[in-house]
Regions:
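Active-site cofactor/cluster-binding pocket
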Residues: 1-181
Length: 181
């Protein structure tokens, strides 16, 4: 198993954190992983993306031109990365902020209304964990247990009390992701 994933959106949406949690989850499950962030000079509001590769075998290069899975959280990311998904790949997008929907017919497209779910949960900071839950439902590259271990590793100890909320958000994401026909 080898999955090459790009996650992209605006800075402040938790894109890099989501990628880091995914990568650490793979490490916790003894998988080979790479995590390669890219972002503009802005801390919030600029574009950010992260490439994560999770594999059972050695990874030759973290630099990719095509992806198995793209998670896009804004219109510029959709326009940039939809053409870079391999035929037969997966595109996941949050319905909030996407005006022109994906058009490719040779990939499987999923919509997840994570922004709405985060508002319902009364915590906008779990947005990225809702997205990650949806991703792991359609492409289970790591387990929930791996994610929980990764949260313990990546979150400062003073924030460990937030792990149950993050795990709840992960489960909610798995419930609300839907394939677009």
């Amino acid at each position: 198993m080898k999955k090459e994933i790009i996650i992209s959106g605006f800075g402040g949406q938790g894109v890099l954190s989501m990628g880091k949690i995914l990568a650490y989850s793979g490490l916790m499950e003894d998988k080979e992983v790479t995590w390669m962030p890219a972002y503009g000079p802005e801390q919030r509001g600029g574009t950010a993306n992260v490439t994560v590769i999770v594999s059972d075998e050695r990874i030759s290069s973290p630099i990719l031109s095509k992806y198995d899975i793209a998670v896009v959280l804004n219109q510029p990311s959709l326009e940039k990365f939809e053409p870079k998904i391999k035929p037969g790949g997966i595109l996941i997008y949050d319905g909030f902020g996407i005006i022109n929907k994906p058009t490719r017919k040779d990939i499987t497209v999923y919509e997840i209304n994570a922004m709405d779910k985060a508002a319902e949960m009364k915590n906008s900071k779990v947005f990225n964990m809702i997205i990650l839950g949806g991703l792991l439902k359609v492409a289970p590259v790591v387990s929930d247990k791996g994610v929980e271990k990764a949260l313990k590793k990546t979150l400062p100890e003073r924030h460990h009390s937030l792990i149950p909320l993050n795990m709840e958000a992960l489960k909610e994401g798995a419930k609300i992701i839907e394939e677009v026909k």
